[in-house]
Amino acid sequence: MLKMESTQQMASSIINSSFEAAVVAATSTLELMGIQYDYNEVYTRVKSKFDFVMDDSGVKNNLMGKAATIDQALNGKFSSSIRNRNWMTDSKTVARLDEDVNKLRLLLSSKGIDQKMRVLNACFNVKRVPGKSSSVIKCTRLMKDKIERGEVEVDDTFVEERMEIDTIDWKSRYDQLERRFESLKQRVNEKYNNWVIKARKVNENMNSLQNVISQQQAHINELQIYNNKLERDLQSKIGSVISSIEWYLRSMELSDDIKSDIEQQLNSIDHINPVNAFDDFESILRNLISDYDRIFIMFKGLLQQSNYTYTYE
């Protein structure tokens, strides 16, 4: 069964994208402030801080754990999701979450983020309008609930304040943005060129590997053809040897029983598989040698009974 881990992969991708966004935000802020910086140093510091915060806060493990639970549910394993559901509906869990929220509120207040800032941030979102300098303020779900509960009032008192207009050096701003754009353009071009070089090397390696595979395949085909030819030649030779032995056997003055026995052994030889044919030949030769040995023993016994001696020449 195919194991699905798409949710974990997506969660990991989101975490990695968040880190890249943090690096871009840090470098952009430094450039807008006109501060000289080393990109590698900023990258290393942001990565170290990002990894520490994500690990120490438990956010990364929490996200990956929930993603793993979803993947297990998609794979048909619901035990983890059932435990999570029971845990989320437990009164102890709710009490602990409420305690954590209170601690976060105290921490934000100690950092100078008061209730006004927290409520406004939770009630509104700002959406940029593409191609325009204006933006759209969007109400969140919390703001909608407050309106429905009558917790929103309209203040009709207006305070007229004198707006001080600062002189903005648009030329320096433009030059700064142009330098930033050129820097980003150069960085993108370098990465693109590096990727092109790597892609060409990979393509060359693939072509070389394909050529080697083609050559090896051609060599294998040649060996297969030669092997088939050799097998056919052996089959033909085996058939010729059997026919020659049968013809020679018929010209002998042996009894019909002996001839029939030898012919049966010859007919039992495998004509298709040369390996089996050689085994059959070996068996026939062993039988012939065994028969010759028995005949020699009988002949030697007759000579001894007749008081004759024999010698080898």
UniProtKB/Swiss-Prot annotation:
Residues 150-206 are annotated as: Dimerization. It holds the Pfam family Rota_NSP3. InterPro entries: NSP3_N_rotavirus (IPR042519), NSP3_sf (IPR036082), Rotavirus_NSP3 (IPR002873). This is Non-structural protein 3. Residues 170-234 are annotated as: Interaction with host ZC3H7B. One of its GO terms (biological process) is regulation of translation. Residues 166-237 form a coiled coil. Keywords: Coiled coil, Host cytoplasm, Host-virus interaction, RNA-binding, Translation regulation. Belongs to the rotavirus NSP3 family. Plays an important role in stimulating the translation of viral mRNAs. These mRNAs are capped but not polyadenylated, instead terminating in a conserved sequence 'GACC' at the 3' that is recognized by NSP3, which competes with host PABPC1 for EIF4G1 binding. The interaction between NSP3 and host EIF4G1 stabilizes the EIF4E-EIF4G1 interaction, thereby facilitating the initiation of capped mRNA translation. It comes from the Viruses. The keyword Repressor does not apply. It is found in: Host cytoplasm. It comes from Rotavirus A (strain RVA/Human/Philippines/L26/1987/G12P1B[4]). Residues 208-313 are annotated as: Interaction with host EIF4G1. Homodimer. Interacts (via the coiled-coil region) with host ZC3H7B (via LD motif). Interacts with host EIF4G1.
